[in-house]
Structures are given as C-alpha cells and as structure tokens.
C-alpha cells in the first residue's frame, strides 16, 4: 500500500459561503492544489491527496487503484531519469560552446554509429537494471518486501515510503511534501524537454542550446512558425 500524504490543515469556511460547514479532506486538497483546468471537475479517484495530483487524467487511465499505484511510481522514476537525461544532453553542449570542453554531439557522433559500450558490457548493464527494476516492481506490489538485502543479510532499509528509500539516496533530506511536489513538477517538465530536444534535433540537426542561441539572435524569424511553414 502506497502511503500518500494528505492535507490535514483546517480551512475556515468563507463568510459568504452557503451550505454545510463541513469540509472533507478532498475539499481541502482541491482548495490547496487546484485543478489542472479551471472549472473542470477532477475524477473521484484523484482527490488531491497524492503529491503532484491536480486531477489530470482525461483518458481515465488511473481509474483502477492498482494502475494508479503503478502510475504514481512511474511518474517519479521516469521524471528522475528525464532530469538526468536533459542534463546530460544540455550541459555538455553548453560547456563545449563556452570552450570549456570538447564533448561530442549527444545524439550523432562523427563517422559511423557508435555505442557507449561493447555488447558484453551492455548485456551486463541490461541484466543488472532488469534485476533492479524487478525489485522495484516487487516493492510497489508489496511495500517493504525488498527492504532486506537478499545477499548481505546484515544490510536492510528502514521502513520507508515506496519510491523514497532515504539514507544514502536522500543525503539532504529532501523528503517533505514541498520537495516532493517540486521533484514531480521538474520531472514532468524534463520529460517534455527531453521530447522537445529530440524533435528539435530531428528537424534541425542541432542541439537545444544552439537552437536557443539562433532564436535569441533573431527571435522574429527563428521560431516554430517559420519551421512549420518551411521558411
């Protein structure tokens, strides 16, 4: 069971409000976070109690509680990977343009296509990551079931919220609700940015920083409108 932080702050009723003075926990969450589209009623299963929940699920993909548990963790993990990926795509290009290093282009290296490692190394990495992902899936299905190290029995994790193991994975104690909200918001932006970088490179054959420089040099002509129109 994924433990979800819920708002417990009392919200005093407005003097102009009419009707029952009682307020539910969902009412507090909605007032605190708001909806992703003003005036649109959020689904009943998205009551604002989860971090980053603004009622966005137009296709009702998370209506099933088991699916919702999986999507919550997928949102966190994919956002973390996206933040690392965006940094890995952007920072080397910026440092190369600044003359501080000479990093190869992140998507296309000169000459024939190359890969980051040999086939045997890639296989070992794949097998290791598969093992880690299986353990993560087990923790989602049965929280706490993978806290004990299966090999070194003297090592174990303390009870924790799924997706937030703490200790060495959280040395600065970024666990309070505000930081979880920020992590999710930045992770979602990073996922969109990652997709944008790929599209830009596919259209222009250039990196995101170079595209930004060209836009700033001539903001009235180097835009998406000119790109779509073929000018």
Curated annotation (Swiss-Prot):
Record: residues binding chlorophyll b 1: 36
Free-text cofactor note: Binds at least 14 chlorophylls (8 Chl-a and 6 Chl-b) and carotenoids such as lutein and neoxanthin.
Chain positions recorded as chlorophyll b 4 binding sites: 136
Main localization (coarse): plastid
Residues reported to bind chlorophyll b 2: 80
GO cellular component term of the entry, any: photosystem I
Lipid bilayer topology: Single-pass membrane protein
Ligand binding (chlorophyll a 3): 183
Annotated binding of chlorophyll a 1, by residue: 56, 188
Family (UniProt): Belongs to the light-harvesting chlorophyll a/b-binding (LHC) protein family.
Protein's recorded name: Chlorophyll a-b binding protein 1B-20, chloroplastic
Gene of this entry: LHC Ib-20
